Amino acid sequence: MFFISANLFSQSNFEKGEKLFAQKKYNEAKIHFDNYLSQFPLNLKTIEYLGDIAGHNKDWDEAIKYYEKIKQQNPQNANYHYKYGGALGMKAKESNKFAALGMIDDVEDAFLIATKLDKKHIESRWALVIFYIEIPAIIGGSETKAQVYANELMQLSKVDGYLAKGYIDVYFKRYKNAEINYKNAHTIGNSKTTFEKLYDLYLNKLKEKAKANKLKELFEK
């Protein structure tokens, strides 16, 4: 009887944690996940949730700790490597340049492993596009490499492919090329994301307010 009660209590902790997490009540969810993990210390989903909560709270060291644990327990899971690389990348961004340099290779490796483990993993390919564009060429940044993963995204999702190419064009101030890519993405996707990218380009980069207003009017119909 006690075993059944304890099991129901622990299950209740996990379900409550999931519900609170879905409601974005992360700190409350953490209490329930911590309780559940104390009884089931190898439950990967719980550890992943705790990593996600740490990430939402920008506690990168804590997020890295959790994601490293789950990727070691299940090294074939692409998403675990992607999340580990993402948390490590955010820590690198907020660290001094010397400390960040020591993390760059591990960030890149984590994203690359994710792409190799899952040929359809969109998030890790997006991460590599941004990674290769944002880091200096002297430590591995490369538009050519970024375009490789933008092309892979194009094969998986036309919207993501055009958005990735538009992102690269905006970074290098090729705004007319970016307009073509963002328009293609918006024509296919017609989503809040595609609208916002094209609207921002018109308003803040091309300084074409009339186009921005027309786009907004059509999107909000």
What do the PLM-derived regions correspond to, one by one?
Residues 23, 57, 91, 135, ...:
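Structural motif corresponding to the intra-repeat A-B loop/turn of tetratricopeptide repeats
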Residues 39-40, 73, 117, 153-156, ...:
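Structural marker of alpha-solenoid helical repeat scaffolds
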Residues 45, 49-52, 83-84, 127, ...:
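Canonical tetratricopeptide repeat
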Residues 29, 63, 100, 107, ...:
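Single-residue signature of alpha-solenoid repeat helices
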Residues 7-49, 55:
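N-terminal leader/linker segments that initiate helical-solenoid repeat arrays
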Residues 43, 77, 121, 158-160, ...:
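Residue-level recognition of tetratricopeptide repeat
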Residues 20, 54, 88, 95, ...:
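Residue at a conserved register position within TPR or TPR-like alpha-solenoid repeats
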